[in-house]
Regions:
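Acidic, Ser/Thr
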Residues: 209-211
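Ser/Thr/Pro- and often Gln-rich low-complexity regulatory segments
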Residues: 38-198, 213-294
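Ser/Thr-rich, Pro/Gly/Ala-heavy low-complexity intrinsically disordered linkers and tails
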Residues: 1-45
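Structural beta-strand segments of beta-rich domains
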Residues: 202-206
Length: 294
C-alpha cells in the first residue's frame, strides 16, 4: 500500500481549503504544555479541508484498494511535531499541482539523539511518533477500536459493514472527531500517459470517467527513493473533471537516479482539524494503480 504519508499542495491550487496554525510549529515541550492547558480538548474536523504540509502532525486514513471490493483498512499515526524539513510553500505550482522541494540543511556540529542539522544551521528536533494513538470507527451503534502497539500507530482491517463511518482519533489527552464519511468509489476507465519516459518525464496526463459520487482525484509523487529527501509533487482536482495534467518541470526533479516513481492515484475525501498540538488530516480514499503507457 502506498503509505498515506503524503503532504499537500497550496490552498490556492487545490479544491480543498487548507487549515493553518496561527503561530509557527512549537517544539515538544511547548506542545506538551499546550496539551495540558488548551481548551477544548475535542476538535471537530472540517470536511473538505487539508493541513498545510509544514504543519501536519497526524494522518488518519480509511481506505480501499482497487480490485478488492468490500475490503477496507484503516490507519492512524501522530507525531509530536511537524517535519521541520518540509517547505512551507511550493517551489512551483499551478491550478492542480504543487512541487515541494525539501529545505536545504545547513551544516552544524554533532547533534544529540533525536536531533539533526536543520535549515537554520543548528541542531533541530525531529518528529517523534506518539505511542498512545487510538482510532475509533463508528457505524450506527457499533464501534471498532484500533490501538497503537508501538510507534507505527494504530492500524488494521475494518470489520464493520458498509463504507461510510464516523471516526474518532485519540492521543495525548486530545480527541479529533469526524462525522459519517463514505469511502469514494474506484474511478472507471482510468488511463495514463507519461511523455518523455521515466528518466526524463516531460508531462503526465491522466483521464477517467467522472463518477456519480465524485470526490477528489489526488496523487503524491515522491522523489526517487535513492535521494532520501522530503521532495515531492502533489496534485488534486475534482474527480468530476475527468482529466489531470502534470507539467514536466514538476516531474523532472523527481526522476533522479533510477527514474520517476509514480505510485498511482487516490480517489479521496479530505478533512482536517487544527488542534492545540498541530494539524491532523483525515482521508477516506480508494487507491488505484495506473499503467503509464508512453
Amino acid at each position: 500500500v502506498d503509505s498515506p504519508d503524503s503532504d499537500v499542495v497550496p490552498a490556492d491550487s487545490i479544491s480543498a481549503d487548507t487549515i493553518s496554525a496561527d503561530t509557527d510549529a512549537s517544539g515538544p515541550s511547548d506542545a506538551a504544555d499546550a496539551a495540558d492547558t488548551a481548551q477544548p480538548k475535542v476538535f471537530a474536523a472540517v470536511a473538505g479541508a487539508r493541513c498545510a504540509p509544514a504543519e501536519r502532525i497526524g494522518l488518519v486514513s480509511v481506505y480501499a484498494q482497487s480490485g478488492s471490493p468490500g475490503a477496507l483498512d484503516a490507519s492512524a499515526a501522530v507525531n509530536d511535531i511537524a517535519d521541520p524539513r518540509l517547505a512551507k510553500a511550493a517551489k512551483l505550482s499551478d491550478a492542480a499541482c504543487g512541487f515541494f522541494e525539501q529545505l536545504a540543511v545547513a551544516p552544524c556540529g554533532p547533534c544529540p539523539s533525536g536531533k539533526m542539522c536543520g535549515p537554520s544551521g543548528s541542531c533541530t528536533a525531529m518528529p517523534v511518533a506518539a505511542s498512545d494513538v487510538k482510532l475509533l470507527i463508528r457505524s450506527g451503534n457499533q464501534v471498532q477500536t484500533l490501538e497503537a502497539k508501538d510507534a507505527s500507530g494504530a492500524y488494521g482491517t475494518v470489520t464493520l459493514a458498509g463504507k461510510s463511518f464516523a471516526v474518532e482519533l485519540q492521543w495525548a489527552g486530545l480527541t479529533v472527531t469526524l462525522g459519517d464519511t463514505a469511502v469514494p468509489p474506484e474511478l472507471a476507465e482510468l488511463t495514463g500517459k507519461l511523455s518523455g519516459g521515466y528518466d526524463k518525464p516531460s508531462a503526465l496526463d491522466l483521464t477517467w470517467t467522472p463518477p456519480a459520487d465524485a470526490a477528489t482525484l489526488f496523487t503524491h509523487i515522491p522523489i526517487n527513493h535513492h535521494a532520501g529527501a522530503q521532495t515531492f509533487t502533489e496534485c488534486a482536482v475534482p474527480a468530476s473533471a475527468g482529466t489531470l495534467h502534470v507539467d514536466g518541470p514538476m516531474l523532472l526533479p523527481l526522476s533522479v537516479s533510477t527514474g520517476l516513481e509514480f505510485q498511482g492515484i487516490e480517489h479521496v475525501r479530505f478533512a482536517a482539524a487544527q488542534t492545540s498540538l498541530g494539524c491532523v488530516e483525515l482521508r477516506f480514499q480508494t487507491f488505484q494503480y495506473v499503467n503509464l503507457n508512453y
